[in-house]
Structures are given as structure tokens and as C-alpha cells.
Curated annotation (Swiss-Prot):
Annotated keywords: ATP-binding, Cell cycle, Cell division, Cell shape, Cell wall biogenesis/degradation, Cytoplasm, Ligase, Nucleotide-binding, Peptidoglycan synthesis
Gene3D superfamilies named among the record's database cross-references: Mur ligase, C-terminal domain, Mur-like, catalytic domain
Name of this protein: UDP-N-acetylmuramoylalanine--D-glutamate ligase
Catalytic activity of the protein: UDP-N-acetyl-alpha-D-muramoyl-L-alanine + D-glutamate + ATP = UDP-N-acetyl-alpha-D-muramoyl-L-alanyl-D-glutamate + ADP + phosphate + H(+)
Function: Cell wall formation. Catalyzes the addition of glutamate to the nucleotide precursor UDP-N-acetylmuramoyl-L-alanine (UMA).
């Protein structure tokens, strides 16, 4: 066994703040080294008992709110703070593997998953890590050609020395305003990815900063200069927002020097993400769509704008609002939504934004919202779960929320 080094410095004492899946991955990795003491702070009371000056390094889990007491004390030790991705980078930086990092408010999970899918379909060894669910250090023992990393603003705030071969920002819209002073601070946290990337581009539909390279969208299809490459109907996806996602992936592959025509064939096979604008079933001529991964206002707006051209959506909205500005969706509500059922911990907060702009009803929970929506829905209408909120008031995460919705649809079908 060997000692643990970071930036060529021997580390003998490390404090781990937070012990979720990321913290556990760091702990498991450090178990491979000798001569290192690791202390773990799992809650506020434990944290205040540690002398931060006494540690060589401090790893912080992304879920730790650095803007709140007692964790504000960490801001004085910025040079000591590292993320799990910094540690991962230290041990792969001398390999030939290429690293690609993607951040954004909406679309980043689709972009990184599609990129990873295409790379594998083209015959490369690729790993997909980060905010998508798999900590990077869990893959440290694997051999790979490409590492695709989904990064959140919280992770970027913790970066110390990582250098990605390519960084990309897409679709920055208000989110996590419970962790940031304002939208500008949140947006800047995303833009800071550029500081940690050798190559970098922005494709931001919301703010009009779109590096599209040689690609453009014309009438539901992607063109490269004047050559048509792909029509949305040739894919297993739907909506212009997915054409935007494909353009981001094509630009990533371009910058990696890969064959775009072969990549197009791979993209046609990509089935999209679970819980992201997925048609569950048509029951009694009503279509039920699961967009549980729509955890902020921008994601729900994108869903509303891509699903229909008519005012025929019954929307299930609610959960933990994270300080979101629901007034931003008023235009889309007016154009596409027949009725809204609002549920969850922040239902009154949401109501305060949309009251007077649409027909709605407050509900106790998502199940009640579903039952009422299925009763109200008429033929050829759509019941859409796109909550624009986090799910932790009622569920373990967006995936469980989506699964519960799918089960409710299945039960409804059995009764029909």
C-alpha cells in the first residue's frame, strides 16, 4: 500500500464533511492508502467540534450548504477544500483518457447520457459519472477512453484543481435559489466551469448565447450547413428541446474529432431518459406523460412547450420549490394548460405566483392530484407530471416520484 498524495503533497489528515454516496466513495477510495487519518462529519453538531486548521485536506459533499451555518466556516479554508472529482482527476490526469464535463439547469442529464451512449455505440470505452448518480471514484479502477461527467453548480463550487478536456454549459435558468443569493450568483457558479476546462463552449437557449457550430434546427430537423442530418421523427425522442440537446452532443463529438455521420446513426437508437417526458400510457383516450425529472421551473416550461400545440394539458405541479420563480411559466400555462393541480410542501408558494393566470386546485399530495386529474381529463387530453420542484417532501427522489406516477397510471388502466 502507498501513502496518499494530492498535488504532490503527502496527505496525512483529512476531514470528510458529509457522508452520502459521494462521501462514501471518497472513504472507500482512501481505504487503499496508509498513513492517513480520515475524520467524518455527518451532521452539524459533529462539524463544530473539528479544528479545520488541523487538516491537510477537507472533502465536502455537494449537498452541504456552504451558505448556511455552521458550514460558512469552510469558506476560510478554500485552498484545503477538494471535491471527489478533484481526487479522481489526480489519478487519471496522466492517462490518455479524455474528460468531458457538462452543466446546466435543464438538459444536462440527457446530454451526458446521450454522449456516453454514442461513445459506447461507436466502440469506445466510456464511463458516465458525477451528478447523474455514480460518484467518479467508484469508477477509478476501470479502463476507459472517455469520462463523461455531469456536474452541478454545487460541485463546481468545490472544484480545486481538476482540468477537463472539454467543458460545456447548457440552458441556465433560475434554480436552487435557496442556496444562492440571486440568479446572477447561480449563473456565475455554472460559468466557473470554464476555469477548470481546457476547451469550453456555451449553448444556452434561454439567454441567447448559443454556440451551435455548423448546426441549426429547421422545421424539426438538424442541418449541418445546408445538409440535412437528422429529423426528430427518425429518433426515439420528441420535442425541439431534444433537437437542441442533440446539437450540443454533436458539438461535443466534433471537438473530440469523432465521425458525426456515424454518431447520427447512434443517436437514432438513443431512447432518452427515464422520467423525462416519457409517455407512460394512453388510458381512456387520455395520454399520461411522466416528466418527474422536471425539478425546476425551466424544465417544466421546456416540457410544456414541446409536448403539444393545443391547450389540452392537465398539469401536476408541486413539491419543494427551491425558491423557483413560477411567474416564468405563466405564458406557457396560458398557451398549453387547461388545468393545474398543485400539491406538496410549497403548494401555497406556487399558488401565489400563478393565482389569477390559470384554473387550478390545491391538493394534499400527488396521489390526490393524479386522481382528480384523471377524473377531469377528456378524450385527447394530456395529464402531465412535470412538478417543477424537488420531491423530498413526499418521495426519496424524482425517480421514486415518477415510479409512483407510473403505478397510478397502471392501476387506472386496470380499473378501466
Amino acid at each position: 500500500m502507498f501513502s496518499f498524495y494530492f498535488n504532490d503533497n503527502k496527505i496525512t489528515k483529512l476531514l470528510m464533511v458529509g457522508y452520502g454516496s459521494t462521501g462514501k466513495s471518497v472513504c472507500d477510495f482512501l481505504a487503499n492508502f496508509i498513513d492517513i487519518t480520515v475524520d467524518i462529519s455527518q451532521n452539524d453538531d459533529e462539524f463544530v467540534n473539528y479544528d479545520l486548521n488541523s487538516y491537510d485536506l477537507i472533502t465536502v459533499s455537494p449537498g452541504i450548504p456552504l451558505n448556511k451555518s455552521p458550514y460558512r466556516a469552510l469558506t476560510k479554508f478554500k485552498d484545503k477544500i477538494v471535491s471527489d472529482i478533484d481526487i479522481f482527476y489526480q489519478y487519471i490526469k496522466d492517462t490518455k483518457a479524455k474528460t468531458i464535463a457538462v452543466t446546466g439547469s435543464n438538459g444536462k442529464s440527457t446530454v451526458v447520457t446521450m454522449t456516453d451512449f454514442v461513445l459506447k455505440d461507436l466502440g469506445y470505452k466510456s464511463i458516465l459519472v458525477g451528478n447523474i448518480g455514480t460518484p467518479a471514484l467508484n469508477k477509478i479502477g476501470e479502463k476507459f477512453d472517455y469520462c463523461v461527467v455531469e456536474v452541478s453548480s454545487f460541485q463546481i463550487n468545490l472544484f480545486n484543481c481538476v482540468r477537463f478536456d472539454l467543458g460545456c454549459i447548457i440552458n441556465v435558468s433560475p434554480d436552487h435559489l435557496d442556496r444562492y443569493q440571486n440568479f446572477e450568483q447561480y449563473k456565475q457558479s455554472k460559468l466557473n466551469l470554464a476555469k477548470f476546462s481546457n476547451d469550453f463552449f456555451v449553448y444556452d437557449v434561454h439567454n441567447g448565447i448559443k454556440y451551435a457550430g455548423e448546426y441549426q434546427i429547421i422545421r424539426g430537423a438538424i442541418y449541418r450547413n445546408s445538409t440535412k442530418l437528422l429529423d426528430i421523427v427518425e429518433t426515439k425522442l420528441f420535442g425541439e428541446h431534444n433537437l437542441e440537446n442533440i446539437i450540443v452532443v454533436l458539438n461535443i463529438l466534433d471537438r473530440l474529432g469523432l465521425d458525426i455521420n456515424q454518431a447520427i446513426d447512434s443517436i437514432k437508437k438513443f431512447k432518452g431518459l427515464e422520467h423525462r417526458c416519457k409517455i407512460v400510457k394512453k388510458v381512456n383516450s387520455t395520454t399520461y406523460i411522466n416528466d418527474s425529472k422536471g425539478t425546476n421551473v425551466g424544465a417544466t416550461i421546456a416540457a410544456l412547450n414541446s409536448i403539444t400545440n393545443s391547450k389540452n394539458i392537465i398539469l401536476l405541479l408541486g413539491g419543494v420549490a427551491k425558491g423557483g420563480d413560477f411567474s416564468l411559466m405563466i405564458k406557457s400555462l396560458d398557451k398549453y394548460v387547461k388545468y393545474v393541480y398543485i400539491y406538496g410542501a410549497d403548494k401555497e408558494y406556487i399558488e401565489s405566483y400563478i393565482k389569477g393566470y390559470c384554473k387550478y386546485q390545491l391538493c394534499n399530495n400527488m396521489k390526490q392530484a393524479f386522481e382528480l386529474s384523471s377524473q377531469k381529463a377528456n378524450s385527447n387530453e394530456i395529464v402531465l407530471l412535470s412538478p417543477a420542484c424537488a420531491s423530498f417532501d413526499e418521495f426519496s427522489g424524482y425517480a421514486q416520484r415518477g415510479e409512483v406516477f407510473q403505478n397510478l397510471v397502471a392501476q387506472l388502466e386496470q380499473k378501466s
